[in-house]
A protein has these predicted regions:
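Glycine-rich phosphate-binding loop and adjoining beta1-alpha1-beta2 segment
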Residues: 168-204
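Non-catalytic propeptide/linker segments at domain boundaries
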Residues: 94-134, 154-155
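Generic structural signal for helix capping and beta-alpha/helix-loop junctions
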Residues: 172-173, 216-217, 265-267
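Generic beta-strand/beta-sheet core signal
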Residues: 142, 166-168, 210, 233-234, ...
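Short amphipathic alpha-helical segments
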Residues: 152-154, 177-178, 243-247
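Glycine-rich phosphate/adenylate-binding loop
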Residues: 1-110, 223-230, 234-435
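Glycine-rich adenosine-cofactor-binding loop
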Residues: 127-172
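A structured beta-alpha segment of the ubiquitous adenosine-cofactor-binding alpha/beta core
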Residues: 193-230, 235-238
C-alpha cells in the first residue's frame, strides 16, 4: 500500500515547489493524461521549479518530472531521473495541484505554489497603470547597454507585452559595473541576455531580437519601426540616432532618446512626438555638444570616431570615462516615465496627471557640479538658480532647415556646437521656458 506522508514536519523538511499556472492549465486542457516535464532545483535551498517544457536558459540541477491528471500515483511512477510528480486537476473552476517526491520508500507531499497567470501577475499595478492595455503595446529598444537594458526590464515589470531588441554587441567585463547583466552573462549577445531578463519578469512577453547594427542595416530597423508604438533610443552615437530619428519622422512614431555626458556628471532626455521637433531639430538648436558625450568603451569610441585610430593606450583611458550606475538612474527613470506616459495616453490611469507636468521636448539633469556643470550653484540654498539634482525642461523650436523633418533640409550634425547652458556662464545665460 502506498504511504503518503503529509505531516507538517515532513512538509517543512522537503522542497518548496513553484509551478506556472498557465502551464498547468495548458496541460489540463490537452488530451494527454501524462506529460514528461522538467524540474530545475536550486540545490541547498530546498526550492525547485517545475515546467512542462525545457527552459531556453536553464538554471540549477535539471531533472525530469511527471505531470499527470490521475489523482492516484504509485511508486512505479518514479524513476532515477523522475524525482517529482505533479497531479493536476480542477475543482470548483480552480486549479488543484499537488506535488510529490519519493523519499526512500515513502512518497512525500511537497508544498506547492502556483505562479500567477498573465492576468494576475501585474495586478498590483492596476490603478496606476492599465496593465491590460500595456500588454498589447510594442516597444522597440535600440541599444542594450546600461540605459537600454535597465529600461527593457522595467518596462517588462510594468507589463509591456511586446519587445523588439536591437544590439549587435556582447556582454563584456567592462559592462558589468553598470549593466543589468551579471558575470554569468559574459560573452553572450546582449539581445539574448536581456530577452532572458525580460522573460524572467514577464514570462508572457513576446521578444523579437535583432543582433544588428541599425546604421548599416537600416531597412531591418525601419520594417520594425513602422509597426511599434514607441522607440527607445539608448545608443551611444549619432549615426544610429539619425537612423532612428528619420524612421520616427517617416512612420510618425513616438521616440524617447537619452544619454549621459562624461563620467555621468549629468545627462539629457529628448522626446519626439509626431509633428513636433525631431532629433535633428534638437541637434540644430545647439543645446547638445556631442564632444561631451560619455564614451562607454574603447570599441564604442572607435566606432563613433570619439577615439581616433592613432590614439595611444593612455589617450584611450583618458577618453573612456564612465560614471556610476547610480548616476544614470535618474536619466533612465525619466525616460521610463515618459515612455509609460506615452503608452498610457488617452487612458485614465494613476500617472495621467504627469501629462500636465511633462510637456517639454527635452530635459536636462546634473548629478554633480563637474565638467559642463562646474559653474552651477550648490544645491544648498540655491533658490531659483540652476543647481544639481533637479530636472530642467526645454522647449525645442522646429528647425525649418532640419535635415530630417523640414522641406528644405540642411545637414548639421552638431558635433561642434554647444548651448550657453553648458558654458562657463551657464547660470546667467540659460533661461528656462516659463510658458
Amino acid at each position: 500500500m502506498l504511504h503518503v506522508l503529509q505531516r507538517k514536519d515532513m512538509l517543512s523538511m522537503t522542497h518548496e515547489v513553484y509551478l506556472a499556472s498557465e502551464e498547468a492549465k495548458e496541460f489540463l486542457n490537452s488530451s494527454e493524461k501524462e506529460l514528461l516535464g522538467y524540474s530545475y532545483e536550486w540545490e541547498g535551498e530546498n526550492v525547485i521549479h517545475l515546467h512542462s517544457h525545457p527552459l531556453q536558459h536553464s538554471f540549477g540541477l535539471a531533472k525530469r518530472c511527471l505531470f499527470t491528471s490521475e489523482a492516484k500515483i504509485s511508486l512505479s511512477d518514479f524513476s532515477e531521473d523522475i524525482k517529482y510528480i505533479a497531479t493536476i486537476s480542477q475543482k470548483n473552476n480552480k486549479l488543484d495541484t499537488k506535488v510529490y517526491k519519493l523519499d526512500g520508500s515513502d512518497v512525500v507531499e511537497i508544498s506547492a505554489k502556483l505562479i500567477p497567470g498573465k492576468d494576475e501577475l501585474y495586478s498590483r499595478s492596476k490603478g496606476l497603470l492599465e496593465v491590460e492595455i500595456l500588454s498589447k503595446k510594442h516597444v522597440a529598444i535600440v541599444g542594450l547597454g546600461s540605459f537600454g537594458s535597465q529600461i527593457a526590464i522595467e518596462l517588462a515589470k510594468a507589463g509591456v507585452g511586446i519587445f523588439s531588441l536591437f544590439d549587435f554587441d556582447r556582454v563584456e567585463l567592462h559592462n558589468i559595473g553598470r549593466h543589468s547583466c551579471t558575470l554569468k552573462d559574459l560573452g553572450r549577445l546582449k539581445t539574448d541576455a536581456i530577452e532572458e531578463a525580460i522573460l524572467g519578469k514577464n514570462p508572457y512577453a513576446q521578444v523579437n531580437k535583432y543582433a544588428i547594427n541599425i546604421a548599416t542595416q537600416k531597412d531591418v530597423f525601419c520594417d520594425v519601426a513602422k509597426k511599434v508604438d514607441l522607440v527607445i533610443c539608448a545608443t551611444d552615437n549619432n549615426d544610429s540616432r539619425f537612423v532612428i530619428a528619420s524612421a520616427l519622422h517617416k512612420y510618425q512614431r513616438i521616440g524617447i532618446f537619452g544619454r549621459a555626458i562624461t563620467r555621468a556628471a549629468g545627462g539629457d532626455v529628448f522626446r519626439y512626438k509626431p509633428g513636433g521637433p525631431c532629433y535633428g531639430c534638437l541637434i540644430g538648436s545647439r543645446i547638445l555638444d556631442s564632444r561631451d558625450e560619455e564614451v562607454s568603451s574603447e570599441e564604442a569610441g572607435r566606432r563613433s570616431g570619439a577615439i581616433p585610430a592613432y590614439a595611444s593606450a593612455e589617450d584611450v583611458n583618458a577618453i573612456v570615462q564612465v560614471g556610476l550606475s547610480v548616476d544614470i538612474e535618474p536619466i533612465c527613470n525619466l525616460m521610463l516615465k515618459l515612455a509609460l506616459l506615452e503608452l498610457s495616453k488617452g487612458m485614465q490611469s494613476g500617472i495621467s496627471s504627469l501629462e500636465e507636468d511633462l510637456k517639454y521636448d527635452a530635459y536636462i539633469w546634473a548629478n554633480r557640479r563637474d565638467n559642463n556643470f562646474s559653474n552651477w550653484h550648490p544645491f544648498y540654498k540655491s533658490g531659483p538658480k540652476q543647481t544639481i539634482l533637479k530636472w530642467y525642461g526645454i522647449t525645442i523650436p522646429k528647425d525649418e532647415h532640419c535635415a530630417i523633418c523640414s522641406e528644405i533640409p540642411t545637414l548639421d550634425t552638431g558635433l561642434k556646437l554647444s548651448h550657453p547652458m553648458y558654458s562657463e556662464y551657464a547660470d546667467v545665460d540659460f533661461h528656462l521656458d516659463d510658458n
